[in-house]
């Protein structure tokens, strides 16, 4: 198991203690049983269908089954599906290798989607059309135009849709955003999001797919290629064909918080420029090697919002990012460093760390009552608990599909910028790259026949 997957799964499954630096119980999944205990009757519990039964798919469904009953599981890897049937459905869940058959079941109320990234949008759109509420793993989309489609269908169907950007349900991150929104740092001038670099690997040997894996179906909308074990399951994120590398994997988290901090849930930066290193050679934006990881390993992209706020997305904060926060408190490899005219603030997931002058001053000058609750739209404390409360009440979840689309668009644009090796301009109103026809074509991808995304 790679460190990224292990850390994330621990974050999802934690039922943790109080956070010493904040004296607040973490929001994410710590208090999940509260709502679950309210549903005393088995008839009150929603029926859940699990689509994607790998490590992360099981992680989110583990949390979901506190509030509902898993009645069906689906995966194109038969071994994954059988393990999920035993684990999630106590051996009673119906097993599928085609998600469409699961969606045909009228008794399923909720689906969890924990597939590789290139399947998220197609499954989510068809699930909404089938009348299901959705909890989908991040990043929600493979391209910018996929995000436009998924937002369109979400508006039309009015289904409850929670994205797995659970840092919005984590106390220190919500508190950091509240401090920014309440002006405790002064005017925000710059945010640096350090998200870690991608993996290197390859060349890998092409093989026959194992008999328990439907490789052709796993590939979905992407080109039909020979099987390499390192292309699929947890390693899919290091291939641009199926994901966006660390830019979308961890950018989905930290860039989302950056957007939230500056009130940019309905927009994206207007300019992008930067540099990157890749593990294989590129030509015209495409990798020239087909048997090795190809997403960026090191990068620094400077973006700017229309109001002048700068957002830097980097694999690690170099020393050129100076701050008044002590080095002993910083983690330059992962976290958000937020610069304000009055002071700086740092927050990350490691030990739920939150530091800066504004944090210290809050002890004598607390945030206004309800500041965090208003920011979180009245959400329940746990991320999954919030989702199931929204299923019950029909309100909008804290990590809604529309704000996520804007944040992940920023990540997609950063990847387009470094793959083409040039600066790009973005019109957030028209949702279109400006003055660059070639770059504009990268807002979508050709989809393999039989696996097209239709609305």
Q: What residue ranges belong to the model's regions?
A:
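N-terminal secretory signal peptides and thylakoid transit peptides that target proteins
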Residues: 1-19
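C-terminal helical cap and adjacent loop that interface with cofactors, partners, or active-site loops
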Residues: 14-20, 27, 35, 59, ...
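N-terminal Rossmann-like dinucleotide-binding module
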Residues: 18-89, 167-170, 258
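NAD(P)-dependent dehydrogenases' Rossmann-like dinucleotide-binding region
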Residues: 52, 184-202, 214-228, 269-280, ...
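N-terminal Rossmann-like NAD(P) cofactor-binding module of classical short-chain dehydrogenase/reductase
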Residues: 111-112
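Beta-strand-loop-alpha-helix segment that lines the small-molecule cofactor/substrate pocket
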Residues: 116-117, 121-169, 183
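Rossmann-like dinucleotide-binding domain that binds NAD(P)(H)
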Residues: 216-308
């Amino acid at each position: 198991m790679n460190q990224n997957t292990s850390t994330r799964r621990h974050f999802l499954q934690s039922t943790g203690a109080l956070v010493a630096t904040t004296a607040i119980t973490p929001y994410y999944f710590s208090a999940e049983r509260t709502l679950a205990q309210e549903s005393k009757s088995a008839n009150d519990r929603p029926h859940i269908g699990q689509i994607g039964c790998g490590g992360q798919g099981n992680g989110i469904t583990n949390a979901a089954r506190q509030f509902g009953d898993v009645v069906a599981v689906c995966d194109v890897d038969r071994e994954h599906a059988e393990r999920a049937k035993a684990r999630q459905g106590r051996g009673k869940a119906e097993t599928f290798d085609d998600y469409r058959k699961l969606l045909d079941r009228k008794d399923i109320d909720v689906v969890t989607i924990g597939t590789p990234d290139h399947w998220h949008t197609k499954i989510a759109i068809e699930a909404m059309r089938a009348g299901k509420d959705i909890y989908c793993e991040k990043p929600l989309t493979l391209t910018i135009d996929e995000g436009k489609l998924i937002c369109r269908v979400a508006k039309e169907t009015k289904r409850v849709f929670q994205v797995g950007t659970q840092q919005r349900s984590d106390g220190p991150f919500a508190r950091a955003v509240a401090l920014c929104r309440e002006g405790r740092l002064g005017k925000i001038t710059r945010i640096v999001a350090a998200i870690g670099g991608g993996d290197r690997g390859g060349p890998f040997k092409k093989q026959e797919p194992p008999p328990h894996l439907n490789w052709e179906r796993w590939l979905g909308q992407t080109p039909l290629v020979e099987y390499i074990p390192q292309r699929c399951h947890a390693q899919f994120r290091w291939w641009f064909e199926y994901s966006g590398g660390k830019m979308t994997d961890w950018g989905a988290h930290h860039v989302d918080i950056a957007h939230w901090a500056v009130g940019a849930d309905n927009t994206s930066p207007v300019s992008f420029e930067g540099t990157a290193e890749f593990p294989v050679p590129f030509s015209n934006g495409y990798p020239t090697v087909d048997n090795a990881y190809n997403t960026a390993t090191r990068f620094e992209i400077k973006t700017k919002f229309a109001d002048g706020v700068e957002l830097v997305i980097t694999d690690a904060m170099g020393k050129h990012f100076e701050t008044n926060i002590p080095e002993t408190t910083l983690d330059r490899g992962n976290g958000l460093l937020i610069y304000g005219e009055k002071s700086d603030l740092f927050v990350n997931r490691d030990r739920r760390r939150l530091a800066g002058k504004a944090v210290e001053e809050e002890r004598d000058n607390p945030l206004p009552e309800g500041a965090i609750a208003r920011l979180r739209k009245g959400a329940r404390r746990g991320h999954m608990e919030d989702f199931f409360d929204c299923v019950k009440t029909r309100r909008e979840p804290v990590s809604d599909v529309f704000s996520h689309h804007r944040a992940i668009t920023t990540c997609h644009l950063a990847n387009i910028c470094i793959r083409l090796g040039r600066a790009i301009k973005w019109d957030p109103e028209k949702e279109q790259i400006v003055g660059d026809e070639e770059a504009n074509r990268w807002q979508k991808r050709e989809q393999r026949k039989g696996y097209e995304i239709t609305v």
